[in-house]
Amino acid sequence: MTSTLRVAFAGTPEFAQIALAAIHQAGFPVVAVLSQPDRPAGRGMQLQASPVTQYAVTHGFAPILQPPSLRRTGKYPQEAAEAIDALTAQRPDVMVVAAYGLILPQEVLDLPRFGCINIHASLLPRWRGAAPIHRAIEAGDAESGITLMQMDAGLDTGDMIAMERVPIGLTDTTGTLHDTLAALGGRMVVEALAKLAQDGKLHATPQPAEGITYAEKIAKDEAALDWSRHAAALLRQVHAFNPFPGASAALDGVAIKFWQAEVLADRPAEAEPGVVLAANAEGVTIACGAGALRVTQLQKPGGKRLPAREFLQGLAIQPGQRFASRG
């Protein structure tokens, strides 16, 4: 399809790039792209463009705007003013925002004729904030989803345009759920833009006043496991922190990351939390506050993710050894 609806896009990571690609492939003219500045990345810490910027460059979108801030009165007033002026010159009808990572001041929210539509990876108002996918898995939620929202000045508080639910499977990680939700978000925003182009408006309803929770940004130190917890809670951590930052625990001073695991209901009553109960081709089984965790994919510093059989060939682990516990 082709459309006269002039779409601006603001986003940074792969989640956003998938939405941008869906909008582009659906035939909507993308008249401006905003993304965060290039950042040092990789072992060489070379400057690297975001997935959104890379897609925009590859497909010839212009202008591509990468201000460090959009606040005229903030730390970077000149960069903010230049970006806002460039965006204004494109006369966007609507701006789609997905995991952009910068605060949009009211001036920017009001700039497009139809405002700004946000793609948020949760069932709002649950898990407003920066890490909704991680937090949903960590909390043991049965489902997640995508909410399209008409943005306002609050933190994910805008009226809801559309919502679709997705079950969270027993083996889902943040990585797998991210991919599912990213594809869903792309489809949903294309449908919303098509409706907006046809009707000239989108119906939106206020978020419920009850059930509000916040998804705080993930801190690296959260990934350290506390073996006094129930094995099921630790499994949720393993899933939630895959692929970032990786659930971990130290064994004799060596930090080991856990990428895949399963819960075993029984363990010897006398086993202290953190003690290795078994280490074989099936996995490394570790006593928890309740039950045990059998870790089936591990990684040592500087190494690759490996199934337990291969990992143990390079780092011997014996029953009776004890993993350090967080806290």
UniProtKB/Swiss-Prot annotation:
Broad EC category: transferase
Pfam families: Formyl_trans_C, Formyl_trans_N
GO molecular function: methionyl-tRNA formyltransferase activity
UniProt keyword annotations, A-Z: Protein biosynthesis, Transferase
Family: Belongs to the Fmt family.
PANTHER family: METHIONYL-TRNA FORMYLTRANSFERASE, METHIONYL-TRNA FORMYLTRANSFERASE, MITOCHONDRIAL
Protein's recorded name: Methionyl-tRNA formyltransferase
Gene name as annotated: fmt
